[in-house]
Curated annotation (Swiss-Prot):
The gene is phnC. This is Phosphonates import ATP-binding protein PhnC. Keywords: ATP-binding, Cell inner membrane, Cell membrane, Membrane, Nucleotide-binding, Phosphonate transport, Translocase, Transport. Its EC number is 7.3.2.2. The complex is composed of two ATP-binding proteins (PhnC), two transmembrane proteins (PhnE) and a solute-binding protein (PhnD). Pfam families: ABC_tran (PF00005). Belongs to the ABC transporter superfamily. Phosphonates importer (TC 3.A.1.9.1) family. One of its GO terms (cellular component) is plasma membrane. ATP binds at residues 41-48. It comes from Bdellovibrio bacteriovorus (strain ATCC 15356 / DSM 50701 / NCIMB 9529 / HD100). It comes from the Bacteria.
Protein backbone atom coordinates (compact mmCIF):
# COMPACT_ATOMS: atom_id res chain seq x y z
CA UNK A 1 0.00 0.00 0.00
CA UNK A 2 1.29 3.45 -0.99
CA UNK A 3 1.70 5.64 2.09
CA UNK A 4 4.28 8.15 0.85
CA UNK A 5 3.83 11.90 0.63
CA UNK A 6 2.24 12.99 -2.64
CA UNK A 7 4.58 13.65 -5.53
CA UNK A 8 1.86 15.84 -7.04
CA UNK A 9 -1.00 17.60 -5.30
CA UNK A 10 -3.66 19.63 -7.08
CA UNK A 11 -5.97 21.93 -5.14
CA UNK A 12 -9.09 23.58 -6.59
CA UNK A 13 -7.60 23.73 -10.08
CA UNK A 14 -9.81 25.44 -12.66
CA UNK A 15 -9.26 26.41 -16.28
CA UNK A 16 -11.54 28.72 -18.25
CA UNK A 17 -10.71 29.58 -21.85
CA UNK A 18 -11.11 33.10 -23.27
CA UNK A 19 -14.31 32.01 -25.05
CA UNK A 20 -15.87 31.23 -21.67
CA UNK A 21 -15.61 27.43 -21.85
CA UNK A 22 -14.75 26.06 -18.41
CA UNK A 23 -12.53 23.05 -19.13
CA UNK A 24 -11.65 22.22 -15.51
CA UNK A 25 -13.73 22.89 -12.41
CA UNK A 26 -12.14 22.78 -8.95
CA UNK A 27 -9.99 19.70 -9.50
CA UNK A 28 -8.51 18.19 -6.33
CA UNK A 29 -6.08 15.33 -6.79
CA UNK A 30 -3.08 13.64 -5.19
CA UNK A 31 -0.62 11.42 -7.04
CA UNK A 32 1.92 9.40 -5.07
CA UNK A 33 5.38 8.21 -6.17
CA UNK A 34 5.24 5.00 -8.18
CA UNK A 35 1.60 5.24 -9.20
CA UNK A 36 0.35 4.56 -12.71
CA UNK A 37 -2.66 6.85 -12.68
CA UNK A 38 -5.00 6.78 -15.67
CA UNK A 39 -7.41 9.60 -16.44
CA UNK A 40 -10.51 8.62 -18.42
CA UNK A 41 -13.52 10.41 -19.82
CA UNK A 42 -15.20 11.47 -23.04
CA UNK A 43 -13.39 13.66 -25.55
CA UNK A 44 -13.74 17.22 -24.30
CA UNK A 45 -14.05 16.18 -20.66
CA UNK A 46 -10.84 18.02 -19.71
CA UNK A 47 -8.27 15.21 -19.73
CA UNK A 48 -5.71 16.87 -22.00
CA UNK A 49 -6.27 20.27 -20.40
CA UNK A 50 -5.50 18.76 -17.00
CA UNK A 51 -2.16 17.32 -18.11
CA UNK A 52 -1.21 20.52 -19.92
CA UNK A 53 -2.00 22.59 -16.84
CA UNK A 54 0.10 20.30 -14.66
CA UNK A 55 3.28 21.10 -16.58
CA UNK A 56 2.19 24.65 -17.39
CA UNK A 57 1.83 24.20 -21.15
CA UNK A 58 -1.50 25.86 -20.42
CA UNK A 59 -2.02 28.41 -17.70
CA UNK A 60 -4.50 27.47 -14.95
CA UNK A 61 -7.15 30.09 -14.27
CA UNK A 62 -7.08 29.41 -10.53
CA UNK A 63 -5.95 26.85 -7.99
CA UNK A 64 -2.64 25.43 -6.83
CA UNK A 65 -0.33 22.70 -8.09
CA UNK A 66 2.34 21.28 -5.78
CA UNK A 67 5.10 19.18 -7.34
CA UNK A 68 7.67 17.59 -5.00
CA UNK A 69 6.41 19.94 -2.30
CA UNK A 70 6.89 23.09 -4.39
CA UNK A 71 3.98 25.25 -5.55
CA UNK A 72 4.21 25.52 -9.34
CA UNK A 73 0.70 26.49 -10.42
CA UNK A 74 1.17 30.22 -9.86
CA UNK A 75 4.87 30.49 -10.72
CA UNK A 76 5.55 33.08 -13.44
CA UNK A 77 9.35 32.94 -13.57
CA UNK A 78 10.27 31.29 -16.89
CA UNK A 79 13.42 29.68 -15.49
CA UNK A 80 11.50 28.07 -12.62
CA UNK A 81 8.86 26.74 -15.01
CA UNK A 82 11.63 25.31 -17.18
CA UNK A 83 13.16 23.64 -14.13
CA UNK A 84 9.83 22.04 -13.23
CA UNK A 85 9.31 20.75 -16.76
CA UNK A 86 12.74 19.13 -16.72
CA UNK A 87 11.47 16.65 -14.11
CA UNK A 88 7.98 16.30 -15.59
CA UNK A 89 8.33 14.80 -19.07
CA UNK A 90 5.43 14.56 -21.51
CA UNK A 91 4.56 12.45 -24.54
CA UNK A 92 1.77 13.26 -26.96
CA UNK A 93 -0.75 11.53 -29.20
CA UNK A 94 1.00 12.74 -32.37
CA UNK A 95 4.57 12.12 -31.15
CA UNK A 96 5.96 15.66 -31.83
CA UNK A 97 9.13 14.40 -33.49
CA UNK A 98 11.24 16.28 -36.05
CA UNK A 99 10.50 14.22 -39.19
CA UNK A 100 13.72 14.86 -41.14
CA UNK A 101 16.06 14.42 -38.19
CA UNK A 102 17.51 11.07 -37.20
CA UNK A 103 15.92 8.99 -34.48
CA UNK A 104 19.01 9.51 -32.31
CA UNK A 105 18.89 13.30 -32.75
CA UNK A 106 15.21 13.32 -31.80
CA UNK A 107 15.99 11.43 -28.60
CA UNK A 108 18.83 13.82 -27.77
CA UNK A 109 16.36 16.71 -27.98
CA UNK A 110 15.14 15.55 -24.59
CA UNK A 111 18.29 17.09 -23.08
CA UNK A 112 17.66 20.60 -24.43
CA UNK A 113 16.07 21.80 -21.19
CA UNK A 114 19.39 21.14 -19.44
CA UNK A 115 21.38 23.10 -22.03
CA UNK A 116 22.30 26.74 -22.23
CA UNK A 117 20.72 28.78 -25.02
CA UNK A 118 24.00 28.66 -26.95
CA UNK A 119 24.34 24.88 -26.59
CA UNK A 120 20.70 24.43 -27.63
CA UNK A 121 21.10 26.56 -30.76
CA UNK A 122 24.11 24.56 -31.89
CA UNK A 123 22.76 21.17 -30.81
CA UNK A 124 25.82 20.38 -28.73
CA UNK A 125 25.59 16.99 -27.03
CA UNK A 126 28.28 15.12 -25.13
CA UNK A 127 29.46 11.58 -25.83
CA UNK A 128 27.85 10.53 -22.54
CA UNK A 129 24.51 11.95 -23.68
CA UNK A 130 24.75 10.11 -26.99
CA UNK A 131 25.45 6.86 -25.14
CA UNK A 132 22.48 7.52 -22.87
CA UNK A 133 20.23 8.22 -25.87
CA UNK A 134 21.22 4.92 -27.48
CA UNK A 135 20.56 3.12 -24.18
CA UNK A 136 17.10 4.67 -23.96
CA UNK A 137 16.38 3.49 -27.50
CA UNK A 138 17.48 0.02 -26.43
CA UNK A 139 15.11 0.18 -23.45
CA UNK A 140 12.17 0.74 -25.80
CA UNK A 141 13.33 -1.90 -28.27
CA UNK A 142 14.40 0.18 -31.27
CA UNK A 143 18.15 0.71 -30.86
CA UNK A 144 18.68 -0.49 -34.43
CA UNK A 145 16.61 2.45 -35.74
CA UNK A 146 18.95 5.13 -34.34
CA UNK A 147 20.34 6.28 -37.69
CA UNK A 148 17.02 6.33 -39.57
CA UNK A 149 15.03 9.48 -40.11
CA UNK A 150 12.00 9.78 -37.84
CA UNK A 151 9.61 9.95 -40.81
CA UNK A 152 10.71 6.45 -41.84
CA UNK A 153 9.19 4.88 -38.72
CA UNK A 154 5.76 3.43 -38.02
CA UNK A 155 3.41 5.13 -35.57
CA UNK A 156 4.27 2.75 -32.75
CA UNK A 157 7.99 3.19 -33.35
CA UNK A 158 7.60 6.98 -33.32
CA UNK A 159 5.86 6.82 -29.96
CA UNK A 160 8.70 4.70 -28.59
CA UNK A 161 11.16 7.34 -29.80
CA UNK A 162 9.06 9.93 -27.95
CA UNK A 163 9.30 7.82 -24.79
CA UNK A 164 13.07 7.50 -25.17
CA UNK A 165 13.28 11.28 -25.65
CA UNK A 166 11.24 11.82 -22.47
CA UNK A 167 13.62 9.57 -20.53
CA UNK A 168 16.51 11.86 -21.49
CA UNK A 169 15.03 14.41 -19.10
CA UNK A 170 15.53 11.97 -16.21
CA UNK A 171 11.96 12.67 -15.09
CA UNK A 172 10.30 11.63 -11.87
CA UNK A 173 6.88 12.07 -13.50
CA UNK A 174 5.80 11.15 -17.03
CA UNK A 175 2.63 12.66 -18.47
CA UNK A 176 1.20 10.67 -21.39
CA UNK A 177 -1.54 12.51 -23.28
CA UNK A 178 -3.53 9.85 -25.17
CA UNK A 179 -0.31 8.01 -26.08
CA UNK A 180 -1.97 5.15 -28.00
CA UNK A 181 -5.16 6.65 -29.44
CA UNK A 182 -3.69 6.84 -32.96
CA UNK A 183 -2.21 3.32 -32.89
CA UNK A 184 -3.56 -0.07 -33.91
CA UNK A 185 -4.63 -2.51 -31.15
CA UNK A 186 -1.47 -4.65 -31.17
CA UNK A 187 0.82 -1.63 -31.11
CA UNK A 188 -1.21 -0.11 -28.25
CA UNK A 189 -0.12 -2.93 -25.98
CA UNK A 190 3.52 -2.68 -27.07
CA UNK A 191 3.65 1.02 -26.14
CA UNK A 192 1.70 0.51 -22.92
CA UNK A 193 3.99 -2.35 -21.91
CA UNK A 194 6.99 -0.02 -22.19
CA UNK A 195 5.23 2.64 -20.12
CA UNK A 196 4.47 0.06 -17.44
CA UNK A 197 8.06 -1.16 -17.50
CA UNK A 198 9.31 2.41 -17.03
CA UNK A 199 6.88 2.80 -14.15
CA UNK A 200 7.70 -0.47 -12.40
CA UNK A 201 11.42 -0.90 -13.12
CA UNK A 202 12.58 2.72 -13.15
CA UNK A 203 10.19 4.01 -10.51
CA UNK A 204 8.86 6.82 -12.70
CA UNK A 205 5.35 7.90 -11.79
CA UNK A 206 3.00 7.91 -14.79
CA UNK A 207 -0.20 9.84 -15.45
CA UNK A 208 -1.84 8.78 -18.72
CA UNK A 209 -5.03 9.72 -20.53
CA UNK A 210 -6.67 6.66 -22.07
CA UNK A 211 -9.94 5.83 -23.80
CA UNK A 212 -10.21 2.03 -23.76
CA UNK A 213 -11.23 0.50 -20.44
CA UNK A 214 -9.54 -2.78 -21.33
CA UNK A 215 -6.21 -0.91 -21.30
CA UNK A 216 -7.17 0.91 -18.11
CA UNK A 217 -7.90 -2.36 -16.31
CA UNK A 218 -4.64 -3.92 -17.48
CA UNK A 219 -2.21 -1.08 -16.77
CA UNK A 220 -3.60 1.39 -14.22
CA UNK A 221 -2.98 1.20 -10.49
CA UNK A 222 -5.62 3.89 -9.95
CA UNK A 223 -8.21 5.68 -12.08
CA UNK A 224 -9.71 9.16 -12.13
CA UNK A 225 -12.66 9.94 -14.40
CA UNK A 226 -13.53 13.41 -15.68
CA UNK A 227 -16.90 14.54 -16.96
CA UNK A 228 -17.54 18.13 -18.06
CA UNK A 229 -14.34 19.23 -16.35
CA UNK A 230 -15.10 17.66 -12.97
CA UNK A 231 -13.85 14.51 -11.26
CA UNK A 232 -16.79 12.12 -11.05
CA UNK A 233 -14.92 8.93 -10.10
CA UNK A 234 -11.69 7.99 -8.36
CA UNK A 235 -10.69 4.48 -7.38
CA UNK A 236 -9.21 1.21 -8.60
CA UNK A 237 -9.77 -0.03 -12.18
CA UNK A 238 -11.84 -2.98 -11.00
CA UNK A 239 -14.24 -0.60 -9.23
CA UNK A 240 -15.51 0.80 -12.54
CA UNK A 241 -18.79 -1.09 -12.67
CA UNK A 242 -21.25 -1.02 -15.56
CA UNK A 243 -23.22 1.62 -13.68
CA UNK A 244 -20.13 3.80 -13.28
CA UNK A 245 -19.26 3.28 -16.93
CA UNK A 246 -22.67 4.66 -17.97
CA UNK A 247 -22.33 7.60 -15.59
CA UNK A 248 -18.92 8.48 -17.01
CA UNK A 249 -19.58 7.89 -20.70
CA UNK A 250 -23.35 8.21 -21.02
CA UNK A 251 -26.25 5.80 -21.21
CA UNK A 252 -25.67 4.90 -24.87
CA UNK A 253 -21.96 4.10 -24.52
CA UNK A 254 -20.61 0.58 -24.96
CA UNK A 255 -17.49 -0.82 -23.33
CA UNK A 256 -14.76 -2.32 -25.48
CA UNK A 257 -14.19 -5.95 -24.56
CA UNK A 258 -10.61 -6.92 -23.63
CA UNK A 259 -10.41 -9.21 -26.66
CA UNK A 260 -11.22 -6.31 -28.98
CA UNK A 261 -8.04 -4.46 -28.24
Amino acid sequence: MIVSEPLLRVENLSKTYPNGVQALKNINLEVHPGEFLVVIGLSGSGKSTLLRCLNRLQEPTSGNIYFSGQEIGQVQDAEKIRSVRSKMAMIFQHFNLIPRQSVLKNVLMGRLAAKSTWQSLWGMFSDAERIEAKENLRLVGIAEKASLRADQLSGGQKQRVAIARALMQKPVLLLADEPVSSLDPATCHVVMDYLRRINQEMGITVIANLHFLSLVRKYATRVVALKDGEIVFRGKPEEITEEWFRRIYGEGAQDVAPNDI
